[in-house]
């Protein structure tokens, strides 16, 4: 198990998508800049797939699995940020699903189109499986 120091701290509004550490002001800063911001407080990576659909208003046909998550995230129409407050709990609780979920989200942040940012909140004393 290792800490995750390689995830940069978000300062201001990013020019492109990515995965960032968030401070208390990051969600409001992005919302003020016109980003759609969804906040999720779940320590279960499987639940996150459902919660993302809820907070971002995915269509009723959303399949609530990783493939459906990837598809719906690629259909975004404007800059979008997901603030995940309990990510450390998810990483420890189910490392395999956490890893797969992070891979899907990382790929989604790299796709062309409006930026997508995943903001990992909470104190950075969290432990992430390596």
Tell me the role of every PLM-derived stretch.
Residues 2-130:
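Positively charged, polar, low-complexity stretches
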């Amino acid at each position: 198990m290792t800490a995750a120091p390689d995830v940069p701290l978000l300062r201001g509004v990013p020019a492109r998508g990515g995965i960032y550490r968030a401070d208390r002001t990051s969600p409001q800063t992005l919302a003020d800049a016109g980003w759609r911001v969804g906040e999720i407080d779940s320590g279960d990576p499987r639940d996150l797939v459902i919660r993302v659909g809820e907070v971002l208003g995915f269509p009723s046909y959303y399949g609530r699995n990783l493939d459906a998550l990837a598809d719906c995230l690629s259909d975004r129409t404007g800059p979008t940020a997901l603030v995940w407050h309990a990510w450390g709990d998810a990483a420890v609780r189910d490392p395999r699903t956490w890893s797969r979920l992070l891979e899907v989200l990382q790929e989604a942040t790299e796709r062309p189109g409006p930026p997508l940012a995943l903001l990992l909140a909470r104190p950075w004393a969290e432990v992430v499986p390596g």
